[in-house]
């Protein structure tokens, strides 16, 4: 705390540096928050959902033709009648040929149909096997016919080839009675490639999940058909991405100490959900890099700015230190009044230097006058001393001749000396009073000039504040235009929202944009009202400032008048002091005349020895006083000589 109070430079550097660092820190924090929101809006709400929706569209487009083809097989009336009639072996080859043609036409892995009555399972190669409820491999068939579902899509291992395939099965009914199941199997190559090729960041994944939570297709083959979604994401996150209608669903979860974002998008009419998981560290990686880069740049800017602050503080403090050094040098005894500060600056430091130089000039002039006066005093004392010495010699010779009238001459001599001494003291006092009055008048004149300059500055400041009030008034017109624009924008956004509502599903996106525009317009209007209120307060403050400055200007005018009256009074006092000084000189002249008369009397009463002895004693005392006075004059000259002019 003591160091803080002793150094203005440290105060400037610390305060300005703290303000600079705080400003940069606020900017970095605002940038980080804004970038985080922008990342969420673009990547989480736009880019990633768009990628998932594109994959869903590709999957639905990939399965569209096979679904139609499988439905055609199940809807074949000849096949339906043949299964209902008991599967005549003579007609079996033509249906096998039909399955072969359907397989080739749709590039299927296999085509099939099975009878619910006999359990016979046919593919393009003929009768493959007989299904049984007791066989675990046939559980899919009986589970499907027992479910009553119109269509069954499943990923399973083909019994004939042992390869993983996507099976699409439809019910074959005749007159409302289930007679069989027909469909086809597709190779998983293209679908698996589509799932594996998904890339969002370095570790982003996408996989297909059945509505019961079983993962059907996963980039890691060990998860496909063997792992529940709840095991992969956690129960809460799995529930979040699997429920919620036909729109995109999102949830966040942690795994192995890392945060993930999970998104789920249902596949229309397929009872599957496309699920994607992406580490949050990869979503926000570029944002974190941008924040670090911004922080580094902000730190570099802060260091450079702090260096500039240090240089600026040193430049501001250097002239003050020069003034301090000069004052310390004068006060320590060096007395160098010839030193001057650089007053070329036009700012407050230049004013300080000019004022200090004027102070030194006035002190130099005053001390010069004192030196001149002390020299004259020393010469006068020497002359008086010489006169006293001569008088002592004459008084010795006159001692025997002045004995007869010693008493009378002694009384007269004392009286004359008292009058002379008093007259000299009065003359010296009046001269000192005159000098002090002249100095006081000069000080008052400088005060008048300073007050007049301050009055002019206050007038200029009042004009500047008035101009500021006029400029603030012009801002009201701009705010009125902004408010009008925001109201028109709000009206246009409302019309756009109405038109978008009329457009139905096609205008839903445009309605969202229109609603955002209306929200922005309302915020603009509220901000405009707040700015207008602030401007009104600013106008009131400017008016108060103008009134205060005008009152201050009037007060300084009164001060100028009072100072002028004081100067006039001091001038009158100076005149009176000069008159008193003239009267003292007349008294001194009269005293000198009386002293001459006394000398004549002394010459007349040379025989009176007592008066001569008294006169000799007084002359000796006067000699001693003159010696002491000469010593004081020498001391004064020596002390004043310590100043360098």
Swiss-Prot record:
Species classification = Bacteria, Pseudomonadati, Pseudomonadota, Gammaproteobacteria, Pseudomonadales
Full protein name: Methyl-accepting chemotaxis protein McpH
Domain HAMP, which positions? 314-368
> Which segments does the entry list as coiled coil?
none
Q: Which organism is it from?
A: Pseudomonas putida (strain ATCC 47054 / DSM 6125 / CFBP 8728 / NCIMB 11950 / KT2440)
Which Pfam family, giving just one, matches this sequence?
dCache_1
Q: What does this protein do?
A: Chemotactic-signal transducers respond to changes in the concentration of attractants and repellents in the environment, transduce a signal from the outside to the inside of the cell, and facilitate sensory adaptation through the variation of the level of methylation. McpH is a chemoreceptor that binds and responds exclusively to intermediates of the purine degradation pathway.
- Primary residence: membrane
Query: Which top-rank group of organisms is this from?
Result: Bacteria
